Amino acid sequence: IKGVRYTPEMFLKRMAKSKRLENIKVRHMNTLYSLCWIFQLRIAIRVTKKTTRYAGYYAGFDEIAMTPGKLAMLPSWELSDVPAQCVLQDKLTEDQALERTWEYNKTGVQRKFRIMSAPPVLEEHVTERMYKPLYLFEFHNTELDEKKYKVLDSLTGDLEDISIT
């Protein structure tokens, strides 16, 4: 995925501004890639017994957070070669991700189209596999001589602890 909101340079710049963290040295170690399933959904909405309307939706499933969501538009992307050890292993199959994404988005469709005579039906879908960058940082406390490792999510800005063995 291209054009992500949070980058290592921005994070390092923010950390350098903080006066409370003067004794903590931060460095960007590596970039990891996590799978995001992107689905283009074609949904059949029965308005009456004889009339069916169709709607198109973009939906996604983030494997690192294991959460489905609705997308306003397709994200931009660009092909790039990355080492295999930097790509995190897939947790779900396409069918499992589609099922969870559809269950999440079906309630939103039902709320939006209250005039339905039957629940919405997923007719077709197109699947895209995109990988979002995750940035691995090392935090070194010079006073305690202690190192910790954290991962920065490029889309949400979440910083999570990890243990490296």
Language-model features: where?
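Acidic, serine/threonine-rich low-complexity disordered tracts
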Residues: 142-165
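Charged, low-complexity helical/coil segments in non-catalytic cytosolic or luminal regions
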Residues: 1-143, 147-148
